[in-house]
Swiss-Prot record:
Its EC number is 3.1.1.29. TRNA binds at Y14, F64, N66, N112. Hydrolyzes ribosome-free peptidyl-tRNAs (with 1 or more amino acids incorporated), which drop off the ribosome during protein synthesis, or as a result of ribosome stalling. Monomer. GO terms for cellular component: cytoplasm. Gene3D superfamilies: Peptidyl-tRNA hydrolase. Keywords: Cytoplasm, Hydrolase, RNA-binding, tRNA-binding. One of its GO terms (biological process) is rescue of stalled ribosome. The record marks D91 as: Stabilizes the basic form of H active site to accept a proton. This is Peptidyl-tRNA hydrolase. Belongs to the PTH family.
Length: 184
């Protein structure tokens, strides 16, 4: 069993923002597998998919980005999921729009959602997919990540969401290092 968490902020006003690209990836998986989202007792929306016999718990924390770990750790405990079976999908300002990078460990890199998860699961050694959203050319980062993708970037971000979902489906069947080799 795997736990796949897409990071974002709950609420309609954040739905299509750069900061919610993690939600978009797990939404794509739920859509592909035609599985509903249900509110869990761990302050998140949960959907269960099955890929080649491997159960995957998809989660969208409802804690807002900066407290994502408050949802992830209790779900790991409840489902008895080991850290090597956890994968976090989140936005990355340091990658161009549409690029993805897979890693098995690393720091939070200034991402508050990742800081919260590292704090709550007490390790930096877990799988992650970073989805590029680029940096603003000028202006504040906060307004930028809470803004929607412009029309010109839509094809690139849609491709990145689909590629990320493909990588997650592969993770159901092969070790993450093989998935990294294929998609990086």
């Amino acid at each position: 069993m795997k736990l796949i968490a897409g990071l974002g902020n709950p609420g309609k006003k954040y739905e299509r923002t750069r900061h919610n690209v993690g939600f978009m990836v797990v939404d794509e998986l739920s859509f592909r597998h035609q599985t509903p989202w249900k509110k869990s007792k761990f302050n998140g929306m949960v959907s269960e998919i099955n890929v080649g016999g491997e159960k995957m718990i998809l989660v969208k924390p409802l804690t807002f980005m900066n407290a994502s770990g408050e949802c992830i750790r209790p779900l790991m405990d409840y489902y008895n999921i080991q850290v090597e079976d956890v994968l976090i999908v989140y936005d990355d300002l340091d990658l161009p729009v549409g690029k993805i990078r897979l890693r098995q460990k690393g720091s939070a890199g200034g991402h508050n959602g990742m800081k919260s998860i590292i704090q709550h699961i007490k390790t930096q050694e877990f799988n992650r997919i970073r989805v590029g959203v680029s940096r603003p050319l000028k202006g504040e980062v906060i307004n930028y990540v809470l803004g929607d993708f412009p029309k010109a970037e839509q094809p690139d971000i849609i491709a990145a969401i689909q590629k990320s979902a493909d990588a997650i489906e592969d993770f159901a069947q092969v070790p993450f290092v093989e998935v990294m080799n294929k998609y990086n």
